[in-house]
């Protein structure tokens, strides 16, 4: 079984949120078997900055669903969307 790399767009619920703290909370929320392989930041609008972690997950049933759910439950997260997925 291989692995999948997914770039996930995480929108904070406020432009005033501390992105470093949010990044730490996202890392702590990862389900077993998943790991983050770097973060990017994307200026969206009006001071709002999205986090774009690249997450490595096993290539099995469910794919990135567990990660998306975990990220969605993190305090300060407005929305979560998979931007790009590829096998590695």
UniProtKB/Swiss-Prot annotation:
Keywords: Elongation factor, Protein biosynthesis. The keyword Protein biosynthesis applies. Coiled coil: none annotated. CDD domains: EF1B (cd00292). The keyword Hydrolase does not apply. One of its GO terms (molecular function) is translation elongation factor activity. Pfam families: EF1_GNE. Belongs to the EF-1-beta/EF-1-delta family. Promotes the exchange of GDP for GTP in EF-1-alpha/GDP, thus allowing the regeneration of EF-1-alpha/GTP that could then be used to form the ternary complex EF-1-alpha/GTP/AAtRNA. This is Elongation factor 1-beta.
């Amino acid at each position: 079984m291989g692995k999948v790399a997914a770039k996930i767009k995480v929108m904070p619920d406020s432009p005033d949120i501390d992105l470093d703290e949010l990044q730490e909370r996202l890392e702590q929320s990862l389900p077993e078997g998943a790991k983050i392989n770097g973060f990017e930041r994307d200026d969206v609008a009006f001071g709002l900055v999205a986090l774009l972690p690249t997450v490595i997950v096993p290539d099995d049933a469910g794919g990135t669903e567990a990660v998306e759910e975990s990220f969605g439950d993190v305090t300060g997260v407005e929305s979560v969307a998979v931007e790009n997925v590829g096998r590695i």
